[in-house]
Structures are given as C-alpha cells and as structure tokens.
Amino acid sequence: MATIVKKQETIQDKDQVKAYLTQKGLVYESYKTPESLDLILGQKGLSDAEKEEVLSGLEYRFDQLKKQHGYKANDLVVLHDEVPGISDMLAKFDKLHIHTDEEVRYIIDGSGIFGFIIDGERFEVHVGKGDFISIPANTNHWFTLDQTMRIKAVRYFKDNSGWTPVYVDESKVLINA
C-alpha cells in the first residue's frame, strides 16, 4: 500500500492516497500479486528465465492493461544492493527529471520512493508490493530505492523511445518548499 509523504502530512489511507494522486494527475491502483509467484519473488535476484516465468504469471494483468491503456510491451526490472553498478543506475533517476512518454510501474516485490514536484508542491510516494502507478509524460519526478534496497517492478510501455530522462532544474518548478 502506497504512502504519501508531504511537507507536514502523511497520507496512508488507501482511498485518500488514490484521491490525492488522482488530483495530481497520477494513476494509482493496488493489485494483489498471485500467490503462485511468492516463492520466486522472494528471491533477491532473478535469472532471465525466472523473469520470463514471472511475466508469464502476470500475463493476465498485461492483457487487461493493453486493452485499457494501449500498452504494447512490458519487462521486469529487478534492483537490489548486489546488482553491479546499482549506484550509477540509481544516480540516473534520483534527480528531478521528466520523460516524454508516461512511466508505468507495477511493484511486485520490495519497495521504493517516487518523488514529485507537481503544481509547485514537493511530495513523495512510497510504493511497495501491489502498487501500480502511472506517471504522465512530462511530469517532474525522481525515483530511488528505500532502505531495503530491493524492488521488482513490471514496466509497461506504449513506446520505448521516451525513456531517456530529461533533467529539470528544481529551482524553476518548486514553489511551496
């Protein structure tokens, strides 16, 4: 279940989280992951074959999202403290940036933090297992792992070409520090 952390407020109620994110133009849902995947998802890392097994086990979700949102492809990203180059990888996304295509994540294990500056307001969304978030194109955000240093997320794409981060000067978008 996602948690919103703002300057002087924390929102944990599922309905309030969804309402707040909807108001900010983000899509948030909470989906249960199939219990049949629990054993494999409990592993720290996954081989390519295991990633394919997980994606196959979630094919029903992809089919739903293709119909609802027009996604054409998906993949599974597995990040943890033993991934070679993890610090450099995270450094690409822990600074304020946008993408020219929407960013869509379904968290199936672990946890992380998406940060946003929308309408001049800074807030964080702490995501965990079962959280689905869609960030519209050109939305100021950043991402980092939390203290667990572990996340598995299915990424959904309409077009892979919009995935280069375009960095944003925070001082030009932050009004309500």
Swiss-Prot record:
EC id: 1.13.11.54, 1.13.11.53
Keywords: Amino-acid biosynthesis, Dioxygenase, Iron, Metal-binding, Methionine biosynthesis, Nickel, Oxidoreductase
Protein's pathway: Amino-acid biosynthesis; L-methionine biosynthesis via salvage pathway; L-methionine from S-methyl-5-thio-alpha-D-ribose 1-phosphate: step 5/6
CDD domains: cupin_ARD
Cofactor(s) listed in the protein's UniProt record: Fe(2+); Ni(2+)
Cofactor note: Binds 1 Fe(2+) cation per monomer.
Catalytic activity: 1,2-dihydroxy-5-(methylsulfanyl)pent-1-en-3-one + O2 = 3-(methylsulfanyl)propanoate + CO + formate + 2 H(+); 1,2-dihydroxy-5-(methylsulfanyl)pent-1-en-3-one + O2 = 4-methylsulfanyl-2-oxobutanoate + formate + 2 H(+)
Residues bound to Fe(2+): H97, H99, E103, H141
Residues at which Ni(2+) binds: H97, H99, E103, H141
SUPFAM superfamilies listed in its UniProt record: RmlC-like cupins
Annotated site location: Important to generate the dianion: R105
A molecular function (GO) term: acireductone dioxygenase [iron(II)-requiring] activity
Cystine connections: none
GO biological process, one term: L-methionine salvage from S-adenosylmethionine
Family membership: Belongs to the acireductone dioxygenase (ARD) family.
Function: Catalyzes 2 different reactions between oxygen and the acireductone 1,2-dihydroxy-3-keto-5-methylthiopentene (DHK-MTPene) depending upon the metal bound in the active site. Fe-containing acireductone dioxygenase (Fe-ARD) produces formate and 2-keto-4-methylthiobutyrate (KMTB), the alpha-ketoacid precursor of methionine in the methionine recycle pathway. Ni-containing acireductone dioxygenase (Ni-ARD) produces methylthiopropionate, carbon monoxide and formate, and does not lie on the methionine recycle pathway.
Assembly with partners or alone: Monomer.
Name of protein: Acireductone dioxygenase
Species whose genome carries this gene: Leptospira biflexa serovar Patoc (strain Patoc 1 / ATCC 23582 / Paris)
UniProt gene name: mtnD
